[in-house]
Regions:
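Extended, highly charged accessory segments
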Residues: 1-260
Length: 260
């Protein structure tokens, strides 16, 4: 992906202003990439809840990346870029309209390559890991329930933390699902570090609070919880996932951990 470190130069052709609001696309995705220079605040420890082993750890100065998944086609010669949703599967296109360089001259290159835009940031990170593979739809439902439960249990403002998923394959061949919770403040504010400090009783209370939130909600009762709403899992920042997250997935996950 490309990091636009120095910002953007807009087209000199300015469209006439209207009262219509710009369309929101919700194309941003956050990925955990890690940083070898991270500071481990709380070493990786294994906690047992019933017959389940859950690993938790917290770090500071850890690294994530925000990726814009729109279809940007970029000129490698001058940096010109445009969004083209008609060629989602193409690796490159030829610019039929021609384009100018930032200096106003016609660019000799007409071949535009598909690229994604992104930027890296560092913050405090907490890992809650299970040695199993959890499908994305189920794992997203769980991580959003965890964010609600952890923030309420620890008294953290909900918008001060966020989360994402990270999968890795262990040497044994077993897949590990990592629920990555992080401070939204660049550089970190110390909120999620408290997760890494938790003992078994405290972790269990966080999970029970998460279960309580999704179980007490009544959305999707006619479909056995095959939906989510703004009272349980949905919020402004996860709108792109509203069609796949389900309250039932989170309920089943936490009940399995806590009571089986």
């Amino acid at each position: 992906f490309i990091i636009p470190e120095y910002g953007f130069i807009i087209s000199p052709q300015i469209n006439k202003s209207t009262t219509k609001k710009p369309e929101r696309t919700y194309r941003g995705e956050i990925y955990y990439i890690g940083d070898k220079k991270e500071t481990v605040e709380n070493e990786n420890k294994e906690l047992r809840i019933n017959n389940h082993i859950i690993k938790i750890k917290s770090t500071s100065n850890d690294e994530l990346v925000v990726i814009n998944t729109s279809n940007f086609f970029v000129c490698d010669a001058c940096g010109y870029a445009k969004v083209d949703e008609k060629h989602k599967e193409e690796g490159f296109i030829f610019d039929k309209d021609y384009h100018n360089t930032p200096y106003g001259r016609s660019c000799i290159n007409k071949k535009l390559y598909r690229r994604t835009l992104g930027h890296k940031f560092k913050t405090d990170v907490a890992y809650i890991s299970l040695s199993c593979y959890l499908e994305k739809e189920k794992a997203l439902s769980v991580v959003y329930a965890l964010l609600e439960g952890v923030s309420q249990y620890l008294g953290i403002e909900r918008n001060d933390i966020s989360g994402t998923l990270h999968y890795n394959r262990l040497d044994s061949g077993v897949w590990e699902t990592n629920f990555i919770l992080f401070d939204t403040v660049p550089g970190g504010a110390g909120h999620v570090r408290r997760i890494g400090e938790a003992d078994e009783a405290q972790l269990k209370n966080m999970l029970m609070k998460s279960l309580e939130i999704v179980k007490q909600c009544h959305c999707g009762e006619d479909s056995n919880g095959d939906s989510a709403c703004y009272s349980c899992l949905c919020n402004y920042y996860n709108q792109k996932h509203h069609d796949i997250i389900k309250r039932r997935y989170a309920v089943e996950f936490f009940e399995n951990i806590l009571y089986k």
